[in-house]
C-alpha cells in the first residue's frame, strides 16, 4: 500500500517537473539554429526564401518538396533533415506528454458566454474551426469579433496576440472593428494596428498569402488566422465537373498549409465556408443544405460549426463535428459591439 502511494506521488512529481520544463520551451525553433548543426548559412537562407522559417515547419515538408527548392540537392536535404531532427522531436511521446502539450492551447472568447460554453471555452489554437451556413447567419460577424477578442489578455479569455485576416469575398470592414473594440474597453486604433489584412482575388493569390505568413508569425506573436471564406475563390476559378478533381487537389494543399500553420505557431485558424443544396438531404428537411468543399474540407477541419438564423435577430450555432465536443447548440445575437449573448 505504502509502495503504491509512493509510486503515485513520484509519478505526480515527475508530471509537475515535466510541465514546468515544458513551459520554458519555445513553441517553435527558428530555422537558423541549423547553422549550429553544421548546415551552410546559404542553404538556410534558401529555406527562408521558400517560406520555411522554423525547424518545426521544415519537418512538416516532404523531402520531395524540399528538393524542389532551387539549390538544394537530395544529399543536402537529407543532411538538413537529420540536423532538424536533433533540434525538434517529431517522434513518439507519452499520453502524459501529449496532455501537457495540450496545456499550451489557448481558448479565445467569442464574446458570447453561451457560445464559449458550447465550444469548451472558445475558439482554440492549434486547430482549424470551420463555420458554415447561409448568408447573414453570423459567420463574418464572429470573424470581426475575434479580431478584437484575440487581442484581449489571457485573464480576460483573450489570446494576447495579433490577427491575420485573409478576405476572399471583400466583406472585411475596419470600421466594424471600432465599436467592438470600444465594447471591450480597447483602443480601436491599437486594435486595428494589430490586424494584418489581405484581400485575395484568386486561389493562387490566397495560397501565396499563406506562404508569406510564416515569416511574420515566426517574428511576431500572432494568435489567430481568419480566412473568410475558404471556398469562394475555388468555386470561381474552377468550373464544371471536368475541373473538380483538380480543384479538390488544390483545396487539399491549401488546407494542409492551414493545418501546418495552426500547429507550427499554435494559432487558431477560423475559416468560414459556404453551403450548397443537398439533393439527398431527405424529404423531411425543408431546403436541405450541406457545407461546400466535400470530403476534403470535412476531414481537414478540427471543429465544424453550423450557423443558422433563429427567431428574430438571434442566430444559432450547432456543433456539427468535433473530436471533444458534444453535439449541441447555442443561441447568440449580433450587436453593435459584435457577437453577444442572446436576450431572453
From Swiss-Prot:
Cell cycle is among the record's keywords: yes
UniProt binding sites for ssDNA: 235, 238, 241, 247, 315
Tissue specificity field: Expressed in mitotic and/or meiotic tissues. Expressed in roots, leaves and anthers and carpels of young fower buds.
Keyword Ribonucleoprotein: no
Disruption phenotype: Strongly reduced fertility and seed numbers due to defects in male and female gametogenesis.
Gene Ontology terms for molecular function: ATP binding; ATP hydrolysis activity; ATP-dependent DNA damage sensor activity; DNA binding; DNA strand exchange activity
UniProt subcellular location: Nucleus
Key words, A-Z: ATP-binding, Cell cycle, DNA-binding, Meiosis, Nucleotide-binding, Nucleus
GO biological process: chiasma assembly; DNA metabolic process; DNA repair; meiotic cell cycle
Chain segments carrying region Disordered: 1-22
Residues involved in dsDNA binding: 235, 241, 247
Domain of life: Eukaryota
UniProt-listed Pfam families: Rad51
Amino acids binding ATP: 133-140
Subunit (UniProt): Double stacked ring-shaped homooctamer. Interacts with BRCA2A and BRCA2B.
Reported function: May participate in meiotic recombination, specifically in homologous strand assimilation, which is required for the resolution of meiotic double-strand breaks. Mediates interhomolog recombination during meiosis.
Similarity field: Belongs to the RecA family. DMC1 subfamily.
UniProt name for this protein: Meiotic recombination protein DMC1 homolog
Name of the coding gene: DMC1
Amino acid at each position: 500500500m505504502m509502495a503504491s502511494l509512493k509510486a503515485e506521488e513520484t509519478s505526480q512529481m515527475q508530471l509537475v517537473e515535466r510541465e514546468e520544463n515544458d513551459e520554458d520551451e519555445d513553441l517553435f525553433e527558428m530555422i537558423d539554429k541549423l547553422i549550429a548543426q553544421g548546415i551552410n548559412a546559404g542553404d538556410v537562407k534558401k529555406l527562408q526564401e521558400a517560406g520555411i522559417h522554423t525547424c518545426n515547419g521544415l519537418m512538416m515538408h516532404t523531402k520531395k518538396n524540399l528538393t524542389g527548392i532551387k539549390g538544394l540537392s537530395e544529399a543536402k536535404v537529407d543532411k538538413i533533415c537529420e540536423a532538424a531532427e536533433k533540434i525538434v522531436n517529431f517522434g513518439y511521446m507519452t499520453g502524459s506528454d501529449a496532455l501537457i502539450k495540450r496545456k499550451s492551447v489557448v481558448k479565445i472568447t467569442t464574446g458570447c458566454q453561451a457560445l464559449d460554453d458550447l465550444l469548451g471555452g472558445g475558439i482554440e489554437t492549434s486547430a482549424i474551426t470551420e463555420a458554415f451556413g447561409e448568408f447573414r447567419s453570423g459567420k463574418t460577424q464572429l470573424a470581426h469579433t475575434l479580431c478584437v477578442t484575440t487581442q484581449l489578455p489571457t485573464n480576460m479569455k483573450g489570446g494576447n496576440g495579433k490577427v491575420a485576416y485573409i478576405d476572399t469575398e471583400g466583406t472585411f470592414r475596419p470600421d466594424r472593428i471600432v465599436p467592438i473594440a470600444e465594447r471591450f474597453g480597447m483602443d480601436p486604433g491599437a486594435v486595428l494596428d494589430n490586424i494584418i489584412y489581405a484581400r485575395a482575388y484568386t486561389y493562387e493569390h490566397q495560397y501565396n498569402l499563406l506562404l508569406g505568413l510564416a515569416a511574420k508569425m515566426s517574428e511576431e506573436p500572432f494568435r489567430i488566422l481568419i480566412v473568410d471564406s475558404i471556398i469562394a475563390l475555388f468555386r470561381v476559378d474552377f468550373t464544371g465537373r471536368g475541373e473538380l478533381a483538380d480543384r479538390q487537389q488544390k483545396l487539399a494543399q491549401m488546407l494542409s498549409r492551414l493545418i501546418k500553420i495552426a500547429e507550427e505557431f499554435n494559432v487558431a485558424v477560423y475559416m468560414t465556408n459556404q453551403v450548397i443544396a443537398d439533393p439527398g438531404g431527405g424529404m423531411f428537411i425543408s431546403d436541405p443544405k450541406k457545407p461546400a468543399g466535400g470530403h476534403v474540407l470535412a476531414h481537414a477541419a478540427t471543429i465544424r460549426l453550423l450557423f443558422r438564423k433563429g427567431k428574430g435577430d438571434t442566430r444559432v450555432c450547432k456543433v456539427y463535428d468535433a473530436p471533444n465536443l458534444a453535439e449541441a447548440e447555442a443561441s447568440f445575437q449580433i450587436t453593435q459591439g459584435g457577437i453577444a449573448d442572446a436576450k431572453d
